[in-house]
Amino acid sequence: MLLWVLALLFLCAFLWNYKGQLKIADIADKYIFITGCDSGFGNLAARTFDRKGFRVIAACLTESGSEALKAKTSERLHTVLLDVTNPENVKETAQWVKSHVGEKGLWGLINNAGVLGVLAPTDWLTVDDYREPIEVNLFGLINVTLNMLPLVKKARGRVINVSSIGGRLAFGGGGYTPSKYAVEGFNDSLRRDMKAFGVHVSCIEPGLFKTGLADPIKTTEKKLAIWKHLSPDIKQQYGEGYIEKSLHRLKSSTSSVNLDLSLVVECMDHALTSLFPKTRYTAGKDAKTFWIPLSHMPAALQDFLLLKEKVELANPQAV
């Protein structure tokens, strides 16, 4: 009996793996639109999919980012300047894409643009500190999706939303984690709404990667700037040594980040080209072995493990 059970499990695993390897045909006539292509995941994705033969439309925030990308890619690739937080810019870009792709529609929309914003204890922050990551990571993503969706429906294509392990587990104060939690919710509702139209919607949850988003120098500068303007009461509660110790912890954590950005692009590739794309992808050793498993554990255990890494406050009773 045990042998039959093992054989059945092996067969299921084999069929699941085989199904995941089945690919679409004729990618040469398929258009894909990628946001956040100045650097990081988006830049590598644009170059990778251009080499594979897709007709890539890469959205960059800056002229310099656009020119640098064009210098490394073929004439098939087109760049557009796009600020995802600017509704008129998004609308105009969608109109240009519509005229460019014609009746073929848009096979792939990869929502990759994102910012980290301020990462600091919640009681250090104002509501304005939350705005930028929520405007870019959430409202920008939603607005781009809504404007491009008719083109994706026409092609019965794919929508790929780049979230984060920060959308599964909160690891710091600021707008980044709330924005990514909301992206996960938007992704799930969009996936169910689009199923009847033959549109596949996938979510990618990278761990910590070495990109401009997680630049320890910029993160440190933002944290120091906030510390300097905190009230004496807050500084007394946290202690003068807190900021130095927390910055040391930050540098230690960023020294062990994933270096291979292609792990995320491979997830994008599977979501774009597989006949049976996954609903969720996890990228990075830390995400697979620590963050995602931890997200399924009881909240008390999550708190215990994460608070072990927190810097102790000097005088929390001084309230």
UniProtKB/Swiss-Prot annotation:
SUPFAM superfamilies: NAD(P)-binding Rossmann-fold domains
Binding site for NAD(+): 34-58, 83, 180
Superkingdom, taxonomy of origin: Eukaryota
Cleaved signal peptide residues: 1-20
GO MF terms held by the record: alcohol dehydrogenase (NAD+) activity; all-trans-retinol dehydrogenase (NAD+) activity; androstan-3-alpha,17-beta-diol dehydrogenase (NAD+) activity; androsterone dehydrogenase [NAD(P)+] activity; oxidoreductase activity; testosterone dehydrogenase (NAD+) activity
Principal cellular location given in the protein's record: membrane
Residues annotated as binding substrate: S164
Keywords: Endoplasmic reticulum, Lipid metabolism, Membrane, Microsome, NAD, NADP, Oxidoreductase, Signal, Steroid metabolism
Tissue: Highly expressed in epithelium of estrus uterus.
EC number: 1.1.1.209, 1.1.1.53, 1.1.1.105
Record-given protein name: Dehydrogenase/reductase SDR family member 9
Native source organism of the sequence: Rattus norvegicus (Rat)
